[in-house]
Amino acid sequence: MASFLESKGITFETHKDHVMFEKSEVTKDDGLPYKVYTPYSRKWMAALDKEGITVFPSENHLDKLLNHHQKLLSHEDLGFEKSDVKAPQYNISTDLIEQYEARRNFPAVAGTSKLGVHLRFGTVSIRHMVSKARSTGNNIFLKELVWREFFQQILWHFPHTQTACFKPQYERIEWRNNENEFERWCNGTTGYPFVDAGMRELNATGFMHNRVRMLVGSFLCKHLLIDWRWGESYFAEKLMDYEMASNVGNWQWVAGCGVDAAPYFRIFNPTDQIKKFDKAHQYIQKWVPEFQELTYAQPIVEHKMARERCLEVYKSALK
């Protein structure tokens, strides 16, 4: 866009508003980008302490905007269509932030802010969110906002990771890419109720709890040995809070091939995850009401076998 406008003699200016710190504002001492989250977050926090949070009282300057009488383009004019899916209301109450660490991993509990879609479309200010998090003294919530900016600077400095593994040796993995199994994963009929609940929630609402995102992503890549790019593409189609940097970064994290990723031998047990995060089956019951009935799908793969197969394939590719 900048190149096009400048070629027409039109001045193009950008103003930082989507993030606290842009792609090259938080770097190592030698100016190179961070590839590991923890040192990046420390530098990010130090920069925040130094620079503080600038407030922009835009409403005080509304009288300076140009008056014109042209009809504004509607959403339909821009190619959008109405949908029955409703954007979730975000919650940034002091109570939620203070209890975030204790509640965030339980999908049946209203323990997350659901801010993603609002940050994506700019209907909430990142400065306001950071200020709110700091006022409660809860660094766990704040660090999740830092992860977002970490992944954004990674995608800027390493644009090839949009479609390629950050760790190139992982391109040697021989994915099975079974289309029937992928379809069952997409539809939430894998026979693993926690996985199925997440996919059905995604398909129905355009949202999925973060803990469940990690599980369904790991299940696709590790249990079914389906290329992470298939899952990333499906999430890009369905998620209302889709941001390329976070989506790519998190998919490569669960697949083990990304920057600062989980080790490849970390393979979630879908049944154990229920015991830890949905013991009373409240979340599962909401999205997979038939999970205890004979009509429920048989498991698409046996966990022990899938785990051993995954480890063998990964080891073979990385040796």
What are the functions of these language-model segments?
Residues 1-41:
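Active-site neighborhoods of enzyme catalytic cores
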Residues 2-4, 83-84, 92-95, 182, ...:
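Generic detector of short, locally flexible boundary/turn motifs and exposed helical patches
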Residues 10, 31-170, 273-319:
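Glycine/tryptophan-enriched, flexible segments
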Residues 10-15, 92-95, 225-229, 261:
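Short linear motifs at secondary-structure transitions and domain/linker junctions
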